Amino acid sequence: MFDIGFWELVLIFVVGLVVLGPERLPHAIRSVARFVSAAKSMANSVKDELAHELKVQELQENLRKAEQMGMEELSPDLKASVEQLKQAAQSVNRPYADVSAKNEATSSSSSDATHQTEATKTSAANTKSE
């Protein structure tokens, strides 16, 4: 990241020691280290996001090529890219109503099972008491 050699680093340390003093220098070094790590983290995050966006853009371009050329004339790589893009589009376009309906069905079936279990326990307790 920075092209700083050993002697430049020693010079910066000595100047910092003279300017800040021995009490404040460790705190200043920690602050600078936090700033540098935050900057590296932000740079890596931006790099990863750009790589992801470029991949999506490449898949979209491959899909456009496929539509123009026709699906029969595609290379295996392009066919795989088209399938990946279609799967990604399907996963994004799923309606939320289906998911909520599945959740309601699961919760109602589990509550029915709970009521049946409680009824069985009650009838078993009544049978034992008689």
Curated annotation (Swiss-Prot):
<comment type="function">
    <text>Part of the twin-arginine translocation (Tat) system that transports large folded proteins containing a characteristic twin-arginine motif in their signal peptide across membranes. Together with TatC, TatB is part of a receptor directly interacting with Tat signal peptides. TatB may form an oligomeric binding site that transiently accommodates folded Tat precursor proteins before their translocation.</text>
</comment>
<feature type="transmembrane region" description="Helical">
    <location>
        <begin position="1"/>
        <end position="21"/>
    </location>
</feature>
<feature type="region of interest" description="Disordered">
    <location>
        <begin position="85"/>
        <end position="130"/>
    </location>
</feature>
<keyword id="KW-0997">Cell inner membrane</keyword>
<keyword id="KW-0472">Membrane</keyword>
<dbReference type="InterPro" id="IPR018448">
    <property type="entry name" value="TatB"/>
</dbReference>
<keyword id="KW-0813">Transport</keyword>
<keyword id="KW-1133">Transmembrane helix</keyword>
<comment type="subunit">
    <text>The Tat system comprises two distinct complexes: a TatABC complex, containing multiple copies of TatA, TatB and TatC subunits, and a separate TatA complex, containing only TatA subunits. Substrates initially bind to the TatABC complex, which probably triggers association of the separate TatA complex to form the active translocon.</text>
</comment>
<keyword id="KW-1003">Cell membrane</keyword>
<comment type="similarity">
    <text>Belongs to the TatB family.</text>
</comment>
<keyword id="KW-0653">Protein transport</keyword>
<dbReference type="GO" id="GO:0008320">
    <property type="term" value="F:protein transmembrane transporter activity"/>
</dbReference>
<dbReference type="Pfam" id="PF02416">
    <property type="entry name" value="TatA_B_E"/>
</dbReference>
<protein>
    <recommendedName>
        <fullName>Sec-independent protein translocase protein TatB</fullName>
    </recommendedName>
</protein>
<dbReference type="GO" id="GO:0033281">
    <property type="term" value="C:TAT protein transport complex"/>
</dbReference>
<dbReference type="GO" id="GO:0043953">
    <property type="term" value="P:protein transport by the Tat complex"/>
</dbReference>
<keyword id="KW-0811">Translocation</keyword>
<keyword id="KW-0812">Transmembrane</keyword>
<dbReference type="InterPro" id="IPR003369">
    <property type="entry name" value="TatA/B/E"/>
</dbReference>
<feature type="compositionally biased region" description="Polar residues">
    <location>
        <begin position="112"/>
        <end position="130"/>
    </location>
</feature>
